[in-house]
């Protein structure tokens, strides 16, 4: 049992580790990412925008006029965050429904910079990885042992949320499977009824034809 909990903790650590990447977009392009998040879980997004400089053939810190419009939608397609940020920043939101959350980003630049190439560095942190424990320890004046206990409690809480989310996904999958099986069954029955009716109609038609020709 203890080994199972250790394996589960390792898997969750891998799933909720920081997701650091960068991508290239034009200033009129919209880029979206999907993050599966349990309910009541904090998500922190760090980003930095760089502007392509043709003179140096590289990316430089973007101009002050270039920022990023960030929009976040939950699994019910409800907008939970929509705001314009500067070219470098940090944003956070808390999920209230489990499921896929869509994070979309696009530039708010004016026509002066239209057509330029941007490089966006993105770092998404979910769950306990979104907590700055150094700041927590300093703010609450925690000892090293107290801080470690706090981290363990947060990890246990995150594991519980993840388990609840997995059960939620299993229930949705089971409901979808049952609904699909039911539709397949009714469709098969409908096809059978149609075939029987067509066969009966053809037999009646042939019988009438033979009677008309006085073959029966």
Swiss-Prot record:
Coiled coil regions, renumbered to chain: 134-164
Transmembrane regions listed in the UniProt entry: 184-203
Cytoplasmic membrane side: 204-216
Domain GOLD: 30-126
Topological domain ranges for the Lumenal compartment: 21-183
UniProt keyword Transmembrane helix, yes or no: yes
Subcellular location, record wording: Endoplasmic reticulum membrane
Biological process terms in GO annotation: dorsal/ventral pattern formation
Leader peptide range in chain numbering: 1-20
Keywords: Coiled coil, Developmental protein, Endoplasmic reticulum, Membrane, Signal, Transmembrane, Transmembrane helix
A GO cellular component annotation in the UniProt record: endoplasmic reticulum membrane
Main localization of the protein described in the UniProt heading: endoplasmic reticulum
PANTHER family tied to this protein: TRANSMEMBRANE EMP24 DOMAIN-CONTAINING PROTEIN
Record function comment: Eca and bai are essential, though not redundant, for dorsoventral patterning of the embryo. Specifically required during early embryogenesis for the activity of maternal tkv, while the zygotic tkv is not affected.
Entry's family note: Belongs to the EMP24/GP25L family.
Protein name: Transmembrane emp24 domain-containing protein eca
Species, as recorded: Drosophila mojavensis (Fruit fly)
Lineage of source species: Eukaryota, Metazoa, Ecdysozoa, Arthropoda, Hexapoda
């Amino acid at each position: 049992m203890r080994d199972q909990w250790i394996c589960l903790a390792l898997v969750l650590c891998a799933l909720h580790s920081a997701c650091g990447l960068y991508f290239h977009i034009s200033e009129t392009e919209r880029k979206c990412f999907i993050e599966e998040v349990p309910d009541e879980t904090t998500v922190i997004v760090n980003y930095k925008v760089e502007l392509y400089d043709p003179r140096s053939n590289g990316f430089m810190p973007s101009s002050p006029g270039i920022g990023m419009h960030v929009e976040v939608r939950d699994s019910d397609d409800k907008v939970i965050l929509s705001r314009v940020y500067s070219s470098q920043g940090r944003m956070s939101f808390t999920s209230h429904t489990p499921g896929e959350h869509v994070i979309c980003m696009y530039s708010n630049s004016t026509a002066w910079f239209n057509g330029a190439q941007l490089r966006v560095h993105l770092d998404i942190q979910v769950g306990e990885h979104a907590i700055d424990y150094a700041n927590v320890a300093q703010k609450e004046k925690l000892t090293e042992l107290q801080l470690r206990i706090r981290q363990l409690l947060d990890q246990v809480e995150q594991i519980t949320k993840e388990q609840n989310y997995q059960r939620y996904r299993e229930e949705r999958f089971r409901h979808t499977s049952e609904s699909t099986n039911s539709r397949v069954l009714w469709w098969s029955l409908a096809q059978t009824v149609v075939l029987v009716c067509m066969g009966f109609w053809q037999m009646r038609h042939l019988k009438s034809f033979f009677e008309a020709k006085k073959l029966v």
